[in-house]
């Protein structure tokens, strides 16, 4: 590839808004995103008006806090641009990395000249307005095409088997995966929690220095582990402090082009951040159809391929920014890459401390890593995750162009393999089953509310189910906190044998 077609990031813009959560400061996502775009253009070359008019592709991650019939078209209208290519991505945290990687591939191939990737959320403002009885559309004039929070499709919740088992929320599924992963590497529940707390403490230190962070305060692991009214247990073993915090108003934008076009628009050479390329992969969308719940072949695949194509060893990368909606994601990456979790804290600050603007988060990571490279870092690896640890994408950025030009592989590889045959609840055997993954969800008063279980029968079939709400006896069989979550964790549940009985579409769990 000719060096002049090397894809580069030329402008980054980030917006933090309404952290005080007032009605007066509430703005819809479109306005926040447009502000981020103008900031990116100014970052590239002053006002950037001509640059924005010349944009020929606009792609956006999914926006959940407000629905738009055609967000790229609305942005194009505001920018006086006439893009030949537009795309609004479905739900998925991997999309910012995938969109930037695809944009870089098109630029390198000469298929486009200037691409814009932008997104954002206004979930904090939407909550403020709802509590105040203010209608964003009729009272504040937010866009009404169609308007309102974006609907969640049934497919976004999980497979029918997952839905029947109550595995329809990330707050339930990710801790279940972590219990399986921890057991597979010989960790006790206390060690799983301590590892997660260390990850999120390191992330909070980064957030404390990030002016776009929603919660910019450094926290130590002991504080993160301490369960109480301000840090209640959500789903074992995750207290609130290690859960993503989506109620934020944040937006980000990246402008990409070739080196030649960048110089044509007057962007200084030292401001260019080269997109070396990336890799995408996907595991089975149905968590219960995966061969094992203790890992992610897709995560390993994208890290392997992105680094191998770039000719980099993990320990040689200057900035490694791994997705951090829940501790299990950086824990898995740390184990696979052979790096300490602190080395994966990156440049953003994590979904709890920086804020978790849903599908847009990694756009902030890419912007923050681009700034790190401009400040002297040589390379950055940005990882993104979507679904229930399902879809993965990683991108490598560099201060200099890669010797081979763009080396990415933006089309995701399918890593799905057939898992164990399911065991319908109606056929649950009377003999004990072995726990593969489990969690207990707590109510807002700090009491165990419901248990969730994945287990294997003696012949290897997998069963999944949830207990009835208020079934304290079953919750006791699945909890790692026999004395309550304010006390130290006890023995692991994963690997233990229990008896399961179907009761009205739910399960009752008894000792083996």
Q: Can you annotate each of these PLM segments?
A:
Residues 101-102, 292, 358-365:
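Short, surface-exposed amphipathic charged segments that create phosphate/polyanion-binding patches used
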Residues 248-250, 361, 390:
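Short, solvent-exposed loop/turn segments at the edges of secondary structure
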Residues 367-374:
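Oxidoreductase and adenylate-handling cofactor-binding alpha/beta cores
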Residues 1-90, 104-112, 116-248, 252-254, ...:
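Conserved "HGTGT" condensation-loop signature of ketosynthase/thiolase-family condensing enzymes
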Residues 112-113, 377-379:
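Nucleotide donor/acceptor-binding cores
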Residues 354-362, 374-377:
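A conserved active-site cap/scaffold subdomain adjacent to cofactor or substrate pockets
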Residues 387:
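Active-site capping/gating segments
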Residues 96-105:
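Conserved phosphate-binding catalytic cores of ATP/NTP-utilizing and phosphoryl-transfer enzymes
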């Amino acid at each position: 590839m000719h060096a002049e077609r090397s894809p580069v990031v030329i402008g980054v813009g980030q917006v933090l808004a309404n952290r005080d959560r007032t009605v007066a400061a509430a703005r819809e996502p479109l306005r926040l995103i447009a502000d981020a775009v103008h900031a990116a253009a100014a970052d590239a070359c002053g006002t950037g008006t001509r640059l924005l008019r010349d944009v020929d592709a606009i792609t956006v991650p999914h926006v959940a806090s407000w629905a738009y019939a055609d967000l790229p078209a609305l942005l194009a209208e505001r920018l006086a641009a006439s893009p030949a290519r537009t795309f609004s991505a479905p739900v998925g945290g991997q999309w910012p990395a995938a969109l930037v990687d695809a944009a870089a591939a098109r630029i390198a191939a000469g298929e486009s000249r200037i691409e814009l990737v932008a997104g954002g959320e206004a979930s904090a403002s939407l909550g403020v307005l709802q509590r105040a009885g203010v209608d964003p559309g009729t009272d504040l004039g937010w866009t009404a095409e169609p308007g309102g929070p974006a609907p969640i499709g049934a497919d976004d919740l999980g497979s029918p088997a997952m839905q029947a088992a109550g595995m329809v929320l990330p707050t339930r599924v990710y801790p279940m995966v972590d219990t399986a992963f921890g057991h597979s590497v010989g960790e006790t529940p206390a060690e799983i929690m301590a590892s997660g707390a260390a990850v999120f403490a390191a992330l909070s230190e980064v957030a404390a220095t990030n002016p776009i962070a929603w919660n910019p305060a450094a926290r130590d692991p002991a504080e993160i582990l301490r369960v109480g009214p301000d840090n209640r247990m959500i789903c074992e073993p995750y207290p609130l402090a290690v859960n993503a915090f989506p109620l934020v108003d944040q937006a980000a934008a990246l402008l990409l082009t070739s080196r030649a076009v960048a110089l044509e628009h007057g962007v200084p050479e030292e401001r260019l951040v080269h997109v070396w390329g990336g890799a995408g992969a996907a595991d089975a969308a149905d968590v219960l159809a995966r061969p094992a719940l203790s890992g992610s072949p897709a995560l390993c695949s994208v890290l392997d391929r992105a680094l191998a194509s770039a000719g980099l060893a993990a320990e040689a990368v200057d900035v490694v920014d791994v997705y951090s909606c829940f501790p299990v994601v950086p824990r898995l990456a740390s184990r696979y890459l052979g790096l300490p979790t602190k080395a994966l804290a990156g440049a953003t600050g994590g979904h709890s401390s920086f804020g978790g603007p849903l599908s847009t988060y990694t756009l902030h990571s890419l912007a923050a890593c681009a700034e790190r490279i401009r400040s002297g870092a040589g390379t950055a690896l940005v990882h993104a995750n979507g679904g229930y640890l399902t879809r993965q994408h990683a991108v490598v950025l560099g201060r200099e162009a890669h010797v081979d030009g763009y080396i990415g592989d933006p089309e995701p590889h399918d890593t799905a393999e057939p898992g164990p045959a399911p065991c319908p609840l109606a056929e649950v055997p009377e003999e004990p089953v072995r726990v593969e993954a489990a969690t207990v969800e707590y109510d807002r008063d700090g009491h165990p509310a419901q248990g969730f279980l994945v287990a294997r029968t003696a012949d290897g079939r997998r069963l999944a189910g949830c207990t009835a709400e208020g079934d304290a006896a079953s919750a006791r069989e699945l909890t790692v906190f026999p004395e309550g979550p304010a006390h130290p964790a006890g023995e692991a549940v994963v690997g233990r044998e229990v008896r399961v009985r179907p009761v009205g579409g739910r399960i009752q769990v008894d000792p083996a």
